[in-house]
Amino acid sequence: MKYENKTVYLEANENYYKGAPKIKYLQWRETSDADKIAGVEQGTIDLSDPSGSKSAFDQIKSINSNGELDGDKIMVNATDNLGYGYIGINADTVKVGDDGSSDASKDLRKAIATVFAVYRDVAIDSYYGDAASVINYPISNTSWAAPQKSDADYKAAYSVDVDGNALYTDDMSDDEKFAAATQAALGFFEAAGYTVEDGKVTAAPEGAKMSYEIIIGADGNGDHPSFAILTDAKAALESIGFTLEINDVTDSNIMWDALNAGTAEMWAAAWQATIDPDMYQTYHSESVKSNYYHINDATLDQDIIDARSSADQEYRKSVYKQCLDIILDWAVEIPVYQRQNCIIYSPERINADTFTKDVSTFYYWYKDIENIEMN
């Protein structure tokens, strides 16, 4: 019908092929995330999609009289997001010498990645609670190609030392794990050619540095799922003489401009995935515009082509597992979290019995929008 004041006004098509929608008029309004839950509570919004964070779920529970996510004021539909959060490392700017594919360059990145990885559990639980889980491979858990914990060769990301020995045991405390990761980082730094003396990194090899920057779009105030990972990692690395500079930008375009220019060293972001897990756009060496990692591996390139050329899902899954292992060996990506998408609505104004059933990652609430009724 029209658009004005950041609102789209829509009128139902009575000749819609699935039947005339029960609701004749809709307004889609641009709203800040901070106002979405309160808007549904106060009646200015009927349905919305706030970020599914721990604080958001706690807010919803406090609004409902039963203290649950589904209650008299707000109903919640939460599904796994088709995508995942990660920390990236540029192999062209974080390397030893002039070869980002060398073992020394990989060891440098593994030193940093190992420290990042050990702080994921605490940070993600603090930010998301039950609304997200830590992942160990650079692929969304919603994908049929994602490795499962029940797989024989499944392992936590960056959980071994420079000699391939497991860093952690089930009975270790968090502090013991943090200490083990920091000690392992020293081993990787030394293997990369850094000078290590008395438990500290004292000098970098040619082409490498003692300080690197990571960019994160956390609104300048640390509001990001991975921000706590960075601050904890910064302190741990500084304790062994290595500096991690955190650049928390208020404008995320600064980060994306650096990625597009190939100048970023490290960054924290999230990928939006597709139903098919084709990896060409993100990891193939000829995908120059979106291979922000600058990973250039002939075996990986061929595996990506082989997997996308087959219709055999089991074969593709096994080849994609090989791809994931290569990406982790290059240490250009630290998988961080699989979060949930959240749709909330007011049962006081929307008839809950008519709301879309069996909402999932791949079946959105608006697939049956024509059946939804207002009270």
Give the role of each language-model region.
Residues 18-29, 208-212, 235-249:
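A local structural motif
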Residues 2-9, 27-95, 119, 125-131:
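Extracellular/periplasmic solute-recognition and catalytic clefts
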Residues 4, 31-35, 102-107, 175-183, ...:
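Soluble non-cytosolic domains of exported or imported proteins
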